[in-house]
Regions:
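Bacterial N-terminal signal peptides that target proteins for export
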Residues: 1-10
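Predominantly extracellular/luminal cell-surface or secreted proteins
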Residues: 74-78, 98-102, 110
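A surface/secretory-pathway sequence property marking extracellular, secreted
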Residues: 85-105
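N-terminal small/polar-rich segments of proteins
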Residues: 21-91, 121-161
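Bacterial N-terminal signal peptides
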Residues: 10-18
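Extracellular beta-sheet repeat scaffolds used for adhesion and glycan interaction
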Residues: 104-129
């Protein structure tokens, strides 16, 4: 009698472990958005880098049962065309800056080429809306004597899953 009670549990466990991932879950969609970094007033005489943070947000919709999803999030070069030498622009004037994946600001956030990094994840997503936030760490090196004005750059955030 005890074996009959245990047998269904064993069969169900084996069936759940043997089921292919695609049949147990449906990933409906994922989207990515980002907040702007605002470095505030830059003082070229301060002797220290200006730093700021922003957020990249990934939102995935899942129906049925949960699943694991592999993804990467990359950033473009911006107007400079170069990951390790990004430039903020103000008309003909430019100012060096960069974006990083870590608080120490040692890992340039790019597309995974030319010594840059991407952020990646393989989270278990549950039914419904799932949100994952990544911090973007920005830095403008010290001692850049530039004309006053508003310096900007625009980058593209790409999520691959």
């Amino acid at each position: 009698m005890k074996q009959r009670r245990r047998l269904p549990v064993v069969i169900l466990t084996c069936a759940a472990l043997a089921a292919p991932e695609e049949s147990s879950a449906v990933l409906q969609s994922c989207s990515v958005s980002a907040t702007a970094l605002n470095f505030g007033l830059y003082d070229p005489l301060s002797g220290s880098a200006a730093q700021s943070t922003g957020t990249v947000t990934v939102v995935c919709q899942v129906s049925l049962v949960g699943l694991f999803v592999n993804w990467t999030v990359a950033l473009s070069t911006g107007s400079s065309g170069n990951y390790v030498a990004r430039q903020l622009q103000n008309g003909p004037n430019s100012m060096s800056y960069n974006l990083y994946t870590n608080a120490a600001r040692t890992s340039v956030w790019g597309d995974g080429t030319s010594g840059t990094s991407v952020v990646s994840a393989n989270p278990f997503l549950i039914v419904g809306s799932n949100t994952v936030n990544y911090t973007v760490y920005g830095s403008i090196p010290a001692a850049q004597d530039r004309p006053a004005g508003s310096y900007t750059d625009t980058l593209t955030v790409t999520m691959t899953y």
